Amino acid sequence: MEAKAKLSMIRISPRKMRLVADTIRNKAVSVAVATLKNLNKDAAEPILKLLNSAVANAVNNNGMEADKLYVKTIFVNEGPTLKRFRPRAHGRAYEIFKRTSHVVIVVSDEK
């Protein structure tokens, strides 16, 4: 069986989120949690919370055992971009993109 969790509108760019997501793909949940706790990236914290949510969904809604779960799928999509302007010299302005991410994680107990 599978259990899913989604996280939307995270104010971290998708490129940075994918670096963290790639480190835990196809790993056991216990290994993934240990990896995320020791990873020195800002994106690790929201992904860790999302992984814990997916495990809780698997245990509470589907009756799966937490120690048999692994990260079957994790992907990061680009969310809406906030556009801001930075004043520059001679009346110019540079556009600043504040990117957001959507993350979906699926845990499963069967390989």
UniProtKB/Swiss-Prot annotation:
Record SUPFAM superfamilies: Ribosomal protein L22
PROSITE patterns in the cross-refs: RIBOSOMAL_L22
Any one Gene Ontology molecular-function term assigned to this protein's record: structural constituent of ribosome
TM segment ranges: none
UniProt keyword annotation of Cytoplasm present: no
Annotated Gene Ontology cellular component terms: cytosolic large ribosomal subunit
Protein keywords: Ribonucleoprotein, Ribosomal protein, RNA-binding, rRNA-binding
GO biological process, one term: translation
Keyword RNA-binding on entry: yes
Source superkingdom: Bacteria
Record's signal peptide: none
Pfam families, alphabetized: Ribosomal_L22
Role summary: This protein binds specifically to 23S rRNA; its binding is stimulated by other ribosomal proteins, e.g. L4, L17, and L20. It is important during the early stages of 50S assembly. It makes multiple contacts with different domains of the 23S rRNA in the assembled 50S subunit and ribosome. The globular domain of the protein is located near the polypeptide exit tunnel on the outside of the subunit, while an extended beta-hairpin is found that lines the wall of the exit tunnel in the center of the 70S ribosome.
Entries under PANTHER family matching the protein: CHLOROPLAST 50S RIBOSOMAL PROTEIN L22-RELATED (PTHR13501), LARGE RIBOSOMAL SUBUNIT PROTEIN UL22M (PTHR13501:SF8)
Family: Belongs to the universal ribosomal protein uL22 family.
Subunit text: Part of the 50S ribosomal subunit.
Listed name of the protein: Large ribosomal subunit protein uL22
Source organism (scientific name): Mycoplasma capricolum subsp. capricolum (strain California kid / ATCC 27343 / NCTC 10154)
